[in-house]
């Protein structure tokens, strides 16, 4: 699949996609994420720069569960924004978790 096509698909999604590698470094932001976060986060930043200690623990726990075989996991519901947050592991062709993204579904 061509990179441009894949990027177009990700940019068409109505929710933010922020992909991080196993070191929790932001490697990709789709168009919606760039619009939402603006200058607050950038590719190359640690995802923990925009998360508190409680969120950091959750992310570490989700990554551990993903390594054990879990797929997308519900993270939280934000009643103020009326959105559900999910943690989604990304695996390579051998099934090894190479990173993750958090996505937000607006209701």
Which residues does each PLM region occupy?
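Sensory/regulatory domains in signal-transduction proteins
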Residues: 32-107
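Sensory modules in modular signal-transduction proteins
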Residues: 1-29
């Amino acid at each position: 699949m061509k990179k441009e096509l894949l990027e177009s698909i990700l940019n068409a999604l109505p929710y933010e996609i922020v992909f991080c590698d196993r070191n929790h470094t932001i490697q990709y932001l789709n168009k919606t994420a760039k619009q939402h976060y603006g200058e607050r986060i950038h590719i190359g930043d640690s995802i923990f720069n925009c998360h508190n200690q409680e969120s950091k623990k959750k992310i570490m726990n989700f990554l551990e569960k993903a390594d054990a075989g879990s797929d997308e996991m519900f993270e939280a519901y934000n009643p103020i924004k009326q959105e559900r947050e999910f943690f989604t592991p990304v695996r390579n062709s051998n099934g090894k978790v190479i990173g993750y993204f958090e996505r937000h579904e607006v209701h």
